[in-house]
Amino acid sequence: MTSPLNRRTLLLGVVPAAALGLSACGSSSSQSSSTASASASASASGSASASASASASAAPSGSATASATADDGYVGYRFNREVPGAGTATLYTDYQCPYCAKAEPKFEEAAKKLDGVLNVTVRHMPLNMHVNAVPAALAVEAAEAQGKHLEMANKLFATQNDWKGISERDKLRTLFNDYAKELGLNTEEFDKVLLASDTVKPIQRDDDHAVKIGVKGTPTFVVNDKVVEGLDSSSSVDDLVSTFKREAGVK
């Protein structure tokens, strides 16, 4: 893989996420690619074309609590109680992806319905086409250090239009610190983690695993490390629940 990202460069928000080993959007092999007539997808040029439903695609690159899959025992941040021995449904997400913003609330609801049945988790996959996806993922990691991963994730999804186009490092950093303050976080600690060189490691780990299992875009739903076809941001909560149970062999 490529060398670790410089933390200051990350916060500029202008370095391609390809530095994480990611590649451009628009894989023709993915169901959620720009060639799929039934979905809205974002092309490699960064422009979105809309039709019936939605996900942003990329060529292969790779309250919630941390938990630890086949790569190193890590399965992502948990959206429900851990069920030892049960299957795991995972959402690969990009906080700048508008389709992830639509998918994640339904994923959260599905997690509630699957509590005690399946493990439901989320992992990072910042796309090359979204210049501030990596800084946003860093903000989520910095919030998780104080137990507020989900709160920061939801804040970023709700305010995408406010930060997605910011290119000045200091302005983006200040805004994310403002969000941390709104969420009741210790901003000094938040900023320290935001700038720490190690904070990118879980993002890199998630992307590496996404590459390994064939994730091609966001949002992508995976059950037991197998990409689930037929689901995207337009899928209902009931569709998510029934599909996850079927793929996991749960009646």
Predicted regions and their residues:
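Extracytoplasmic thiol/disulfide redox context detector
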Residues: 2-129, 243-251
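C-terminal cap of thioredoxin/glutaredoxin-like
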Residues: 2-5, 9, 27-37, 181-251
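Structural alpha/beta surface segment adjacent to cysteine/selenocysteine redox centers
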Residues: 90-96, 101-175
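Short clusters of hydrophobic/aromatic residues that line enzyme substrate/ligand-binding pockets
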Residues: 79-81, 163, 228
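Surface-exposed charge patches
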Residues: 141, 178, 208
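Internal amphipathic alpha-helical segments of the cytochrome P450 catalytic fold
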Residues: 22, 149-153, 187
